[in-house]
Regions:
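Catalytic beta/alpha-barrel core
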Residues: 6, 142, 158-169, 179-191, ...
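Conserved, mostly hydrophobic/aromatic
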Residues: 53, 100, 125, 174, ...
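Glycine-rich, proline-tolerant flexible connector loops at the mouths of alpha/beta enzymes
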Residues: 126-144, 300-302
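Alpha-helix-loop-beta-strand connector modules within alpha/beta enzyme cores
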Residues: 139-163, 196-203, 252-266
Length: 302
């Protein structure tokens, strides 16, 4: 439920409303916009205080049918969120390119990749130090050594670093080295992990699960924001369908739908959707045309 306050509402009036809701057992998030203050009431049973809230001084409108993900919805925050990573802004006027290898394999490989993507115009280096694999026998990443190599590549090139965190107990370690923490598609429903990254300040890149709906993705983002971290970037990376010609099916419709439903920035991963490098440029152009705020592209020096 969302309460829209009158533009003339005083600070004391706002404080009284927040105090009433908190004393009633709800979490409260206040968003200031040019249209006025939006007060999101987070928690089950909000309808029990609807009548009392509607009658309070300063409340202009009550929206009881607000989405079940109030903190990430446009209803809560009409203006688009810009996620800043020092001088890199995702969701602003610039199309931000993130690029790099799927996994950090060696010092030579990641430094060569960093040099190449920087020269091509990327602002963020991607690379996996911890890799969740479908097979337990596949390469799982270099771990802490991979994080150290990513940090060295950042020092050398000035690129920001995004890398995946796969377990709650690794969040602090990854946050020590990375500028952006990635939640991969396989972990989009890992709620303990989502809550853990929500309790640290680094931006979070949330990839859509391969069989997840747009609403399920927004619920996952809500976990992160509800934990206290509003710096979330959403990533469409393709979903699993009956089609077998490509690795996944890139859901371009998700980009404008997400832009309509949420204030969070949206980027697209054309590489994991395509599965073949010759198709990546076309999907990347299509993603930009659909309104994506950035691209995350797989690049390998070999």
């Amino acid at each position: 439920m969302i309460a829209v306050l009158e533009k003339s509402a005083s600070l004391k009036t706002k404080a009284d409303i927040v105090r009433f809701l908190e004393q009633s057992g709800f979490r409260v998030q206040v968003s200031e916009t040019p249209e006025g203050s939006f007060v999101s009431v987070v928690g089950e049973g909000a309808e029990t205080v609807a009548d009392a809230l509607r009658d309070m001084r300063g409340v202009a409108e009550l929206r009881p049918d607000a989405p079940a993900y109030p903190l990430v919805s446009r209803a809560h925050k009409p203006d688009a969120t810009r996620v800043k990573v020092e001088d890199v802004v995702i969701g602003g006027r610039e199309l931000v390119i993130m690029a790099g290898p799927c996994s950090v394999e060696s010092r030579e490989q990641i430094l060569a990749a960093a040099d190449a993507v920087r020269a091509a115009g990327a602002r963020v280096l991607r690379g996996g130090a911890f890799k969740p694999r479908s097979s337990p026998y596949s390469f799982q990443g270099l771990g802490k050594q991979g994080l150290e190599l990513l940090a060295e590549a950042r020092d050398r090139t000035g690129l920001k670093v995004v890398t995946e965190v796969v377990a709650p107990e690794d969040v602090d370690l990854v946050a020590e080295y990375a500028d952006v923490l990635q939640i991969g598609a396989r972990n989009m429903h890992n709620y303990r992990l989502l809550s853990a990254v929500g309790m640290q300040p680094r931006p979070v890149l949330l990839k859509r699960g391969m069989m997840s709906t747009v609403d399920e993705m927004l619920h996952a983002a809500e976990y992160v924001v509800a934990g206290g971290n509003p710096r979330v970037i959403l990533c469409e990376r393709g979903i699993r369908t009956f089609e077998t010609s490509s690795r996944n099916t890139l859901d371009l419709c998700a980009v404008p739908i997400l832009k309509e439903r949420t204030h969070l920035p949206v980027i697209v991963d054309p590489s994991h959707a395509a599965g073949r490098r010759e198709w990546v440029p076309a999907l990347a152009r299509a993603a930009v045309a659909a309104g994506a705020d950035g691209l995350i592209v797989e690049v390998h020096p070999d």
